[in-house]
């Protein structure tokens, strides 16, 4: 009678082939465990020997000498005496010896005992690990020997199948994956041709949209404002105008495509393509600002915020592309200028002039320059300044000039230096006796009125320094009467008013301001 066929031929065939391998694995693991046990026994014996030696060394220095039996060969002993009980020779290794005391030898023994204990612990860990492996191998052998308890699953790989995938390579943005890398597998025979056509149309559509997106992105990046204002000056070049013309031509090419024609149907009838925004806008790119004004504010109010968003990306005009540029306003930096002893000003005249230029250039361009606002005593110092190397420098005091040559109101003619040294001492002594607080305040007001008249001039007219003849306070003596060509102001920035003084002495005379003296000189 024949035996029934085995339903699991692979398992029965694999069991006899696997049994000797499992048995060999078990034997090797048992050898490791046995070797570890032998080493542990050896190191335990060494540890016991070190313990006995440590006890002997601890009691050895108690006596000066000991009677002992000295080994003489492997089987013979002879009586002897142990002397120098506190002197021990220690083997350091490689036949190197060192002499030390018994107490030092005890410390060396303790150090070596720690090394022995560490070695024993490591061997115990290895033995425990392999004991668990031996148990697992025994269980595996039992399962392999028993029929039906274990099933070996094998999967055969056909050699005719080839994996054609490639390594992933970083691709350019806005580019689709290659079809050759995706559709490597063979399609079934029942795949319809309609699906292939749909995929092809989809990829064509995606390519077209990507081209349009790239073109629009390049136009938005390359577009620049018509007028750029940087640091209070208008900056424009022919290259920017040429770039704008090129961008316009590119936009016309985009509008010819099918996708943009469908997108622009809802926007062609609107007023977004007039190149204007609903309200005057001040925008900038990379720190440069530009103005776009809209004269017809009421025509585009119905569009709202949607018109601005569409205007930013899709606005097209025959001659220019309206673009919105945003910027963050920054407060002008106010410079702290130390003018001298007790005066410290917080202003920058150059920043204020640049700010006024930007305001005037953004407007009609013909607005008169605004008058200085004087609300505090510190504002007066902004009007009374000197010109040093083309820059405004505040004075230490409005009653005197820091530099006669660079003063705004000083006279720099050659004849002024001739009589200046002779008349300085006399005029200063007179001014010290006759100057009062009211004179200084009235002179400031008169100076401010003259500055207001200069501010009313157009922007193109540059203010000129005072170059007239001034008659200062002098003695009544006819020898000191100034000649018109030699009468120059000692204090050129001090406007003074005419005052009648009581004739206390012969050295006093009438006091006339330099501006009134100039008018009197012209009348004469």
UniProtKB/Swiss-Prot annotation:
GO terms for biological process: cellular response to growth factor stimulus; cellular response to steroid hormone stimulus; intrinsic apoptotic signaling pathway in response to DNA damage by p53 class mediator; negative regulation of intrinsic apoptotic signaling pathway; negative regulation of phosphatase activity; negative regulation of transcription by RNA polymerase II; regulation of cell growth; regulation of transcription by RNA polymerase II. One of its GO terms (cellular component) is nucleus. Its main location: nucleus. GO terms for molecular function: chromatin binding; phosphatase inhibitor activity; protein phosphatase inhibitor activity; RNA polymerase II complex binding; transcription corepressor activity. The modification Phosphoserine is found at residues 361, 431. Residues 296-307 have a biased composition (Acidic residues). Phosphorylated. Phosphorylation occurs essentially on serine residues. Phosphorylation occurs in response to androgen treatment in prostate cancer cells in a mTOR-dependent manner. Phosphorylated; hyperhosphorylated in mitochondria in a mTORC-dependent signaling pathway. Phosphorylated at Ser-361 by RPS6KB1 in a growth factor- and rapamycin-dependent manner. It is found in: Nucleus; Cytoplasm; Mitochondrion; Cell projection, Dendrite. CDD domains: Prefoldin_URI1 (cd23159). Pfam families: Prefoldin. Transmembrane segments: none annotated. Belongs to the RNA polymerase II subunit 5-mediating protein family. Involved in gene transcription regulation. Acts as a transcriptional repressor in concert with the corepressor UXT to regulate androgen receptor (AR) transcription. May act as a tumor suppressor to repress AR-mediated gene transcription and to inhibit anchorage-independent growth in prostate cancer cells. Required for cell survival in ovarian cancer cells. Together with UXT, associates with chromatin to the NKX3-1 promoter region. Plays a central role in maintaining S6K1 signaling and BAD phosphorylation under normal growth conditions thereby protecting cells from potential deleterious effects of sustained S6K1 signaling. The URI1-PPP1CC complex acts as a central component of a negative feedback mechanism that counteracts excessive S6K1 survival signaling to BAD in response to growth factors. Mediates inhibition of PPP1CC phosphatase activity in mitochondria. Coordinates the regulation of nutrient-sensitive gene expression availability in a mTOR-dependent manner. This is Unconventional prefoldin RPB5 interactor. The lineage of its organism: Eukaryota, Metazoa, Chordata, Craniata, Vertebrata. The gene is URI1.
